[in-house]
Amino acid sequence: MPKQSEKISDSNKKNIAIDEKFSIGDIEILPFSIPHDAANPCGYTLFSDNKKISIATDIGHMNNNIIKNIDGSEFILLESNYDPEVLKCTKYPFKLKSRIAGPTGHLSNQVAGQTIN
């Protein structure tokens, strides 16, 4: 049986704010807003030793704010999780298909590829 996770101590918790940098060790982290159907979703850009890495998951659509924040990154992690044509053919209910492909749902594989290029 898996061991139950221990409670995270309050000293190891930190509230973060969109567009306000914070640090963990020598890594500066900048949270940036992303469109998704959740409370205050964000992506992150990490800076250390003159290097820049960006991470953004659960993106409903690509926008100028995301592009601005990931621009110049040496490594970009974007989540994309559907092909529009395959999604159309699934047995998912219309409401779920609409949520996935909607402006606050998820990024298609095609849009993620176009963004990286």
Language-model segments: which ranges?
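Active-site HxH/HxHxD metal-binding segment of metal-dependent hydrolases
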Residues: 1-21
